[in-house]
Regions:
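Short, glycine/proline-biased beta-turn/loop segments that scaffold the active-site neighborhood
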Residues: 120-135, 217-219
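Short, surface-exposed loop or secondary-structure junction motifs
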Residues: 23, 77, 81-82, 135-339
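Short, surface-exposed beta-strand/loop micro-motifs that present aromatic residues
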Residues: 340, 347-353
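Acidic/histidine-rich, surface-exposed loop or edge segments in extracytoplasmic proteins
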Residues: 23-33
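Active-site SXXK
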Residues: 46-52, 63, 69-71, 95-122, ...
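Short, conserved catalytic-motif segment at the N-terminal edge
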Residues: 33-95, 118-120, 167-170, 174
Length: 353
């Protein structure tokens, strides 16, 4: 499990409000009282994490909290897996991000292309992917799929029969719709796989190549990548699960390979899952977003672009473009402001900003 929160909401008015940095902040360490947060914050977070581990929610995890460019809490807890000899977790432990891939990688790439004028959210998916030509899908636009309103089903176990991008595109094209495009919000992995394929068609690069060049590399996120199954990273990666025959693949201990079976069947680089990262790297990414698309002199997107992509798109849904925003019973809890945005992942990952 990994949880990261970049806090922007006020927690109390009993102490003077700290002076914010004059320019876009670069992360530094601080104490809760430095940024007007409760003095017992760290002790409270320690207790929550330790209780969760003791109750078996996870063998370990990492939690980071920051405000005004100060990381006031970044700490690893427990171990990488349940084995007694397993390595302890720290801020550099790499986790399978699961559906955080949708926002950290795929949405970031799409946002860059839209800002550059290479991606038009109101064009149909078929105009970018002519193979996506089923009559019932002709009206599906890019805006619909990045807000999960394309009418596609949430998921299917295609990994039991199919492999690779081309086969997945063909099968998604053939799958029946769950609703009329544009009428309902259904969280769908297919939406972000299609977004990935559009990005790759526009750029002529694979998603991992493009997002590493345009986002992870410039930001210095050196531990954020797809397919990290090499000797260099293996000892830092927390195993995800033991895959049994029930999943149809029998991969054994899933360690250094993507947990999501459809992402694995596509090749490990997928728009909906497959990214690995650390709390340290995600703190940089989160601060870039809080800075309006810039970090340490590196501009990823313009503030107006970021504001547009992180705002709810419909009164009928909390969904922004790629991102989610707070709603009743959402994972944001009760204290993030209405302007916040975030996402979660199946493997226990979470980011709220």
């Amino acid at each position: 499990m990994i949880a990261i929160a970049a806090i922007a909401a006020c927690t109390t008015t009993s102490r003077p409000i700290p002076v914010r940095p004059s320019g876009p902040p670069v992360l530094s360490s601080g104490k809760p009282h430095d940024v007007n947060m409760r003095a017992d914050l760290n002790a409270t977070l320690d207790s929550i994490m330790k209780v969760g581990i003791a109750e078996g929610a996870a063998p370990g995890g990492v939690l980071a909290v920051g405000r005004y460019g100060r990381i006031v809490h970044m700490k690893g807890y427990g171990r990488q897996d349940t084995a007694a000899a397993s390595a302890p977790v720290d801020e550099n432990t790499m986790y399978d991000m699961a559906s955080l891939t949708k926002v950290i990688a795929t949405t970031s790439a799409a946002m860059i292309l839209e800002e550059q004028g290479q991606l038009d959210l109101d064009r149909t998916v078929a105009s970018y992917l002519p193979e996506f030509n089923a009559p019932d899908k002709a009206a599906i636009t890019m805006r619909m799929i990045v807000t999960h309103r394309g009418g596609l089903e949430a998921f299917a176990a295609l990994y039991k029969e199919f492999r690779g991008r081309d086969q997945y595109l063909a099968q998604i094209n053939l799958r029946p719709l769950k609703s009329t495009p544009g009428t309902e919000t259904v969280y769908s992995d297919w939406d972000l796989i299609l977004t990935q394929l559009v990005i790759e068609r526009i750029t002529g690069r694979t998603l991992d190549q493009f997002v590493t060049e345009k986002v992870f590399g410039p930001l210095g996120m050196t531990s954020t990548m797809f397919t990290p199954d090499s000797v260099q990273y293996f000892s830092r990666i927390a195993p995800t699960e033991v895959d049994t025959a029930t999943g149809g693949l029998m991969r054994g201990l899933v360690h250094g390979k993507v947990h999501d079976e459809n992402a694995w069947a596509i090749g490990g680089v997928a728009g909906h899952a497959g990214l690995f990262s650390t709390t340290h790297d995600l703190s940089i990414f989160a601060q870039m977003l809080l800075n309006g698309g810039e970090y340490n002199g590196v501009r990823i997107v313009k503030p107006a672009t970021l504001a547009r992509w992180t705002a709810p798109q419909s009164g009928a849904s909390s969904r922004a473009l790629g991102w989610d925003t707070p709603s009743k019973n959402s994972s944001a809890g009760n204290y993030f402001s209405a302007r916040s945005f975030g996402h979660t992942g199946f493997t226990g990952t979470s980011i709220w900003i």
